[in-house]
Amino acid sequence: MSDNPAILTLAADKNYLRYFKKYQIPALTNLGTGFGMGAIITTFVLGLSALDGNNYAPAALVGNLGAVIGSIISTRLMLRFTRRSFGADAMSQGDGGVPLARDYRVVRQGSVASRFLEAMLDGGKVGVQMGIDIVPGVLVICTFVMMLSGGPADGARYTGVAYEGIGLLPAIGEKLEFILRPLFGLQSPQSIAVPITALGSSGASLSLISRLVGEKLANAHDIAVFTAMCMCMSGYLSTHVAMMSALGYSRLTGKAILSHSVGGLCAGIAAHLIYSLIALIF
């Protein structure tokens, strides 16, 4: 629920990996990404009520449910791919390709103090390395999306203020509205920028959500869809490559991205259908 790469700290623990079969380990990337930034996104959505006075708690709950559905679909699809590659019986492997036994626990050498210090240093090193691996993708994709999202500030000419761009994504949203509205039920064509930004960074997409709510371009239904897609996608284009590389399965990165693309779309569709059903009943 904190961030996608947080699951890599568990994947680096041989005592944790011994409970998994080999084909299940690459799917940890999809499972971890499915709930990445979940706590931050949900808290942010609940705070949107300060902008217009509406209660967005039901939308946040529906969005979380949609993210769970999308994560299940993404992980299951990835497991189908990995099961074909590694089989269903091979156990996870440690250093040197030796299978990890469930009844054998790896223990650090040395005293309690030295093991504590070594664990602290290893944790810091893993955290710094994850940041170095992820930041370039986040910067590139988010900058690219921002350039394609906004238009001139005053509608006629560019002034150099924040959020100016060429306005391509809203134009695409208008052209594809006949598809996007039945699938996601989004109120405004500009809303398409939110899930696209979430491909690179769900944190960056939050600023777009607050702007849409402030300009009355998004309602509670849209917030539910945004929550589901931002949680499930959670910047996977910028993190999947680094996460799969850290796990040692770079050749499966394409399949992981494909699986999560389907899962993210299903999360948004599920949130749309669930919220519409609840609104119809109540």
Regions found by a protein language model. Give the residues of each.
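Membrane-embedded helical hairpins/re-entrant loop segments and their flanking transmembrane helices
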Residues: 1, 176-188, 210-221
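C-terminal transmembrane helix pair
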Residues: 4-73, 198, 202-282
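Alpha-helical transmembrane segments of integral membrane proteins, especially early/N-terminal helices
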Residues: 24-33, 97-102, 155, 186-191
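Transmembrane helix-loop junctions in multipass membrane proteins, especially transporters and channels
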Residues: 51, 79-87, 150-155, 276-281
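Hydrophobic mid-bilayer segments of alpha-helices in multi-pass membrane transport proteins
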Residues: 62-74, 90-104, 134-144
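Intrinsically disordered, low-complexity non-transmembrane regions of multi-pass membrane transporters
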Residues: 79-125
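Juxtamembrane non-transmembrane "cap" segments at the membrane-aqueous interface
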Residues: 91-103, 162-166, 195, 226-231
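Transmembrane helical segments that form the transport core of multi-pass membrane transport proteins
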Residues: 108-202
